């Protein structure tokens, strides 16, 4: 049976409109950074109001907070774009696709995968910020989020992050699969081999995959959970640097 030919034109690609984005904005929270800033760090050092280590810490805290702000922005834009393309419509069952569904699915898949990458960078940036905030001393290149979590002295902060990790456990699995294993959004067409004693049994592919509707729901719950964590941590990690 001849396969169906789908032609996607450049004109089929449409960036989300203002009204479409506004519709997504209405139902989703904002991702906040912590607002750490010190207007005159060198003055504090020269006037001896602060020591070198404290000014150094303040500078790094501001840096990672700006990085967090930027990465929150990238994650948010990716999320909004994915949601718009999902809202434009396509069924989970590809056999039921009409022509306009293909471009919506292609665009959703693209932004969804990028979303999971940005989620990981936001989480790692938060780890870098906590490393500086609590003066843990982890080298930037050797910092792992789980190591930072283990050294957090504040139980309320630790609990907030552990609760977040539970809420986003599937998110992490999706991200790891996209990055290191098979893409979750397309059927796994690989054959299998089962070892039974001295025999090998060749098996057909299982064609398992995660439906777009399930990925969409996970993205939404992840975005809400991250916004909640950042708001909670902003209250638990008061601004401790000068010039505020």
Predicted segments, located by residue:
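Short, positively charged
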Residues: 122
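Hydrophobic alpha-helical segments and helix pairs
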Residues: 76, 80-83, 87
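Acidic, Ser/Thr/Gly/Pro-rich intrinsically disordered interaction regions
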Residues: 2-77, 91-92, 99-110, 128-244
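Acidic, Ser/Thr- and Gly/Pro-rich intrinsically disordered linkers and low-complexity segments
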Residues: 86-94
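Extended HEAT/HEAT-like alpha-solenoid repeat tracts in very large eukaryotic scaffold/adaptor proteins
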Residues: 108-119
């Amino acid at each position: 049976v001849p396969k169906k030919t789908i032609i996607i034109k450049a004109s089929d690609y449409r960036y989300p409109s203002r009204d479409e984005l506004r519709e997504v904005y209405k139902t989703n929270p904002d991702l906040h950074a912590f607002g750490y800033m010190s207007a005159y760090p060198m003055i504090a050092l020269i006037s001896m109001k602060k020591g070198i280590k404290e000014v150094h810490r303040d500078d790094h805290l501001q840096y990672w907070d700006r990085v967090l702000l930027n990465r929150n922005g990238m994650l948010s834009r990716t999320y909004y774009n994915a949601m718009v393309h999902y809202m434009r419509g396509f069924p989970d069952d590809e056999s039921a696709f009409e022509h306009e569904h293909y471009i919506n699915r292609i665009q959703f898949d693209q932004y969804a995968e990028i979303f999971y990458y940005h989620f990981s960078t936001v989480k790692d940036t938060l780890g870098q910020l906590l490393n500086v905030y609590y003066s843990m001393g982890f080298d930037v290149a050797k910092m792992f989020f789980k190591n930072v979590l283990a050294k957090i002295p504040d139980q309320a902060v630790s609990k907030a992050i552990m609760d977040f990790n539970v809420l986003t456990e599937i998110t992490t699995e999706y991200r790891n699969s996209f990055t290191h294993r098979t893409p979750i959004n397309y059927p796994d067409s690989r054959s299998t081999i089962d070892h039974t004693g001295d025999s090998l049994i060749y098996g057909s592919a299982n064609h398992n995959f995660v439906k777009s509707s399930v990925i969409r729901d996970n993205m939404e719950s992840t975005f809400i959970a991250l916004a909640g964590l950042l708001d909670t941590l902003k209250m638990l990690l008061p601004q401790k640097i000068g010039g505020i």
